[in-house]
Design a protein with these regions (language model features):
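Classical eukaryotic N-terminal signal peptides for Sec-dependent ER targeting/secretion
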Residues: 1-5
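Mature extracellular/extracytoplasmic regions of secreted and cell-surface glycoproteins
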Residues: 6-163
Length: 164
């Protein structure tokens, strides 16, 4: 019986959307294309995904901006999703994406951290080399530069894009 319950639980866990990129060492320049890739949810549950650009520690994440909303995470043709990287402060390898399943859903998935650099490629090391709990995952607090704003795109609008 416990094997059956484990198999049922494992099947449910594997049905979620799974971010696959960006990853450690990936770098994107502000003003250029940023991409996020994921493996589509085959359970049919992740049909209203919101993608956030985040920073902060693993235990105290901070939303930098909303990248897109209304993404159908079950549609594999929408991955990779491309958007314009914003101007951020600091330019560093402290950013990651959080994908949530619907506005009121506690379900989330995350990418690993990646760098956003200046248009000329300048960046600085993360402010912290380890997480508060001691894990060797560099992090820092980032935000949009100069009070800039980024408009989230509703997927399906003329400005939102995905590419193969």
């Amino acid at each position: 019986l416990s094997l059956i319950l484990f198999a049922a639980y494992a099947g449910t866990a594997l049905a979620d959307i799974t971010p696959t990129a960006p990853g450690p060492g990936d770098t994107f320049a502000a003003g250029s294309d940023c991409t996020i890739k994921w493996t589509a949810d085959v359970s049919g549950q992740w049909t209203n995904v919101t993608i956030y650009l985040m920073s902060g520690s693993n235990d105290n994440m901070t939303r930098v901006t909303t990248v897109a909303s209304g993404v159908d995470g079950t549609d594999s043709s929408l991955s990779p999703y491309t958007w314009t990287c914003p101007e951020v402060d600091p330019y560093s390898a402290i950013y990651f994406y959080q994908l949530t399943n619907g506005a009121n859903s506690p379900e989330s998935a995350w990418t690993t951290r990646f760098a956003i650099t200046s248009a000329s490629g300048d960046s600085q090391p993360p402010a912290h080399t380890t997480q508060p709990a001691g894990d060797a995952v560099p992090w820092g607090e980032g935000h949009l530069a100069s009070g800039g704003t980024v408009s989230a795109q509703e997927v399906g609008s003329d400005d939102a894009s995905s590419s193969d």
